[in-house]
Structures are given as C-alpha cells and as structure tokens.
C-alpha cells in the first residue's frame, strides 16, 4: 500500500488514474481546483475511505494547508506524486492563459514538496512541446527540440509545459526524484463532453446529429491512445528510477478525415454531415509518437486500437450526454 498524491485528480486522466490506483489498495489524496476537473467524476469515490479530496489551486499558497492534511491523513508520509494539474484542451487553456502559465510554473512548489517527503514525482508534460514538427522529425522522438511559436495563441500551454520541464531538469540535478512523460492525444471515459478536443467533439456531434466539424482540410494527422494504455504507462514509469523524458502515445496515425468517417461508421444511426472550418493558428499539421524509449524502459506498448477504443468511448458518451448539456 502506497500513499499517493495526485494534482488534477478530478480531470480526465486523473479520474482514470485514481480508479486504477485505488484498485491496488493505495491511499490517495487528490487536489483539484475544479477549473477543468469535473465534480461529476467524484461520484464513484464518495464512499471510498481510501480516496481523499482537497479543493485547492496550486497557483496560490495552498501548500501549508496541504502539508497539514498530509500530516493528519497520511501520517506525514507520501510515496508518489503525480502532477496532472493544467488545462490541456485549447478551448479551456485559452480562456485564462496567464493562469495556464502560472499552473505550469507551480511545478517548483511541487518539486519542493516531493523533496520534503522524499517522494517520486511524475510530471505530465505533453506532445505540444514539439510544436508543429517538420517532415524530418516525424514521428517525434524525445531528442527533437521542437518547433514552437513562443508568441502564438497556444504558447501559454506549449511554452508553459516546456519551462516546467526545464524546472524539473534542474531540480532533478539537486536530488528531486522526478520524471517527465510527454503525453500524446488521449481519449476515453471521463472526458468532458465540452472540452473541445477532437474525439469528444466528433463523437458528441455525431450522437446528437450535429455537423461533425473538421478544422482545416482534414489531412492533418494525429496518433490517438486509449486512456487505459496511458494509465498503464504512467504507473509502470513511476516504478522506475528514470528521469526521461518519455513519449506515451499510440503510434498509429490517422487524419482528421479518417477519424470523422470512422466515428460516423461506428454511429450508423447518426445523420451528421462533415463540415470544414478554418484551421486555428499554430495548430500542428502532424503529430505521431515515437515510443521506442518507453518500450525499452518499461515495456510500454499500446494494446487498444482506435476502432476498439472509440467503441468504448461512444458507449460512455451515450450515457454522459443524458446528464450533460453539450455546447458545441
């Protein structure tokens, strides 16, 4: 049994991670400001004595109160920390770009917390640190330095995650047991129907018989990993003493046109049409994970293909849309 602290525990990845870690009889403390984390995701944990919640924002001074809670609930002991705190959807992080930047900068306080308790720390970084890769760097491996616009609309997230990696690199050199994972597009249950990401958009639009909206001409590509594969990777990476960074994503690559047509195929009752709108500035043309390093370190290899994962995700959203107002 471990004592595990999760920042961003009410979000999409966080909720799935809590689910898996509680199955292993760990005691878990989740911190979330519920800016993008969802209170609906907490229902399943209400009567679980091993899952505790603390509402707080890591960009303000919550750490003294958090340490008091760790002292009282965790016998002043933490084994592992997962930092998932940060809005990850452009629709969400562009609403408050300064707060998005400050959330990434708050990794300094989390590093100090990890060192105080001699805990392992896993930082959820992103494939967005690679920006808009050229053809010579496709797929992207961890040695690629990226092609990021530092003054663009997405910079608050992309550059925030890059500086967070730099901070972790420096803390690692002075003894922080931290590690970095660069997460590629991920989907599955507990996604917010209104988070604006492509799979949640396409599936919800199709289920509601709305137009499936593709931005650009649909030839831009992504690799999509199902959430269960990511959660396996995060837990296995945490077991190692490696710093990384490591990529985690499904190396199968699909265009937006292929994705939209697959969603329509899997929801045959949908009357949705596919429409096209202008591609937002700095939206990457292609993104594909090279997972050689993660596979060699701890055997990470996604098992769930896109069609299988979409079927599971569609079933989740069929239930979710009965309880949620879909805005897009």
Predicted regions and their residues:
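N-terminal Rossmann-like NAD(P)+-binding domain of SDR-like oxidoreductases, especially those catalyzing
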Residues: 1-184, 228, 312, 316, ...
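Nucleotide-sugar-dependent glycosyltransferase donor-binding/catalytic pocket residues
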Residues: 14, 60, 191-192, 223
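C-terminal substrate-binding subdomain of Rossmann-fold SDR/epimerase-dehydratase oxidoreductases
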Residues: 17, 56, 185, 204-328
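Short, conserved catalytic or interaction motifs in soluble domains
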Residues: 36, 189, 250
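Short, solvent-exposed loop/turn segments at secondary-structure boundaries
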Residues: 94-96, 135, 190-195, 285
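Residue-level signature of the cytosolic catalytic core of signaling kinases
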Residues: 136, 152, 191-195, 252, ...
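Hydrophobic alpha-helix immediately C-terminal to the catalytic Tyr-X-X-X-Lys motif of short-chain
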Residues: 163, 167-171, 202, 259, ...
């Amino acid at each position: 049994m471990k004592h595990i602290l999760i920042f961003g525990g009410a979000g999409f990845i966080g909720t799935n991670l809590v689910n898996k870690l509680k199955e292993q009889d760990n005691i878990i403390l989740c911190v979330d400001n519920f800016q993008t984390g969802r209170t609906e995701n907490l229902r399943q944990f209400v009567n679980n004595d091993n899952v505790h919640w603390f509402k707080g924002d890591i960009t303000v001074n919550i750490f003294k109160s958090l340490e008091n809670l760790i002292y009282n609930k965790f016998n002043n002991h933490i084994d592992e920390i997962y930092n998932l705190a940060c809005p990850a959807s452009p629709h969400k992080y562009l609403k408050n770009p300064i707060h998005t930047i400050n959330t990434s900068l708050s990794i300094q306080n989390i590093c100090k917390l990890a060192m105080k308790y001699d805990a392992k720390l896993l930082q959820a970084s992103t494939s967005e640190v690679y920006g808009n890769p050229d053809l010579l760097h496709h797929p992207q491996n961890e040695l690629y330095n990226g092609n990021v616009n530092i003054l663009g609309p997405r910079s608050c997230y992309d550059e925030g995650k890059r500086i967070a990696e730099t901070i972790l690199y420096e803390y690692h050199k002075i003894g922080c047991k931290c590690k970095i994972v660069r997460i590629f597009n991920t989907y599955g249950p507990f996604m917010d129907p209104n988070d604006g990401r492509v799979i949640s958009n396409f599936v919800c639009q199709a289920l509601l018989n709305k137009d499936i909206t593709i931005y650009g001409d649909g030839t831009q590509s992504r690799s999509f990993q199902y959430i269960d594969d990511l959660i396996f990777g995060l837990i296995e990476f945490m077991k190692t003493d490696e710093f990384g960074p490591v990529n985690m994503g499904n190396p199968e690559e699909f265009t937006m046109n292929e994705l939209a047509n697959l969603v329509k195929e899997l929801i045959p009752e949908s009357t949705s049409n596919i429409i096209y709108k202008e591609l937002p500035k700095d939206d990457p043309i292609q993104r594909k994970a090279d997972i050689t390093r993660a596979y060699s370190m701890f055997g990470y290899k996604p098992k769930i293909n896109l069609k299988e994962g979409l079927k599971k995700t569609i079933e989740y959203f069929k239930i979710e849309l009965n309880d949620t107002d879909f805005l897009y």
